[in-house]
Amino acid sequence: MLGLGRVFSSAVRPRTLIRAPINKRSFLWYSTEAAKEEKPAEEKVAETENVDVKELQSKLSELKSKYEAKDKEVAELKGSIRQSLADYRNLENRMKRDMEQTRAFAVQKLTKDLLDSVDNLERALSIVPEEKRNNRESNKDLVDLYEGLAMTESNLMKTLGKYGLVRYDGIGEDFDPNIHEAVFQIPVEGKKPNTVFHCESKGFQLNGRVIRPAKVGVVKGDD
């Protein structure tokens, strides 16, 4: 019985694990191989980073070129707009001048046609003696006619004056061949030589330009 217990005791006794000895050379070989396997991954990361930088540089260069092209295009458009505005202003000014010249020409033709009517009204008024104009009781019809003609002439000259027509006689002024036409010259006592002392027909200027000179008598100087 005692012998059976020993056999059973030795049968259930746990076995002791024995660690195999580590070979240093094998460990170094495994470490080197692992390092060799890890190195290509690092190189791939570096290569990927290099590729990303190059792509960014390429995109930046492309964007810069596009920006410069757009900037140039905008500058050209601005220049075209400025030129178009300048051309428009020049055209507008030219059209304005042409319209003014056309208007002035039309007014000049109209006023020249009306000068005879103005002269006739003036002559009609000048032939009525002053004493009869001032005596309404005896010459009522004549005075009424005179006042009607005077009002007609005044209104006509005001209307023509709106378009730049000016009437002048030149009496007392120095003779100017640009605005006066001398019809005779005589010595006049107390008058300055070469001055206008008489007007046969008045002159007219339209917007500063003579359309008919005044026909005048001029004081003659001593020879």
From Swiss-Prot:
| Name of the coding gene | mge1
Question: Has keyword Chaperone?
Answer: yes
Keyword flag Hydrolase: no
The identity of this protein, by name, is GrpE protein homolog, mitochondrial
Q: Which Gene Ontology MF annotations are present?
A: adenyl-nucleotide exchange factor activity; protein homodimerization activity; protein-folding chaperone binding; unfolded protein binding
One record GO biological process = protein folding
Q: Which GO terms describe its cellular component?
A: PAM complex, Tim23 associated import motor
Tell me where in or outside the cell this protein is found.
Mitochondrion matrix
What Gene3D superfamilies does this protein's entry cite? 3.90.20.20, Head domain of nucleotide exchange factor GrpE
Q: Which SUPFAM superfamilies match?
A: Coiled-coil domain of nucleotide exchange factor GrpE, Head domain of nucleotide exchange factor GrpE
Instruction: Briefly state the protein's biological role.
Output: Essential component of the PAM complex, a complex required for the translocation of transit peptide-containing proteins from the inner membrane into the mitochondrial matrix in an ATP-dependent manner. Seems to control the nucleotide-dependent binding of ssc1 to substrate proteins.
Q: Which InterPro entries match?
A: GrpE, GrpE_coiled_coil, GrpE_head
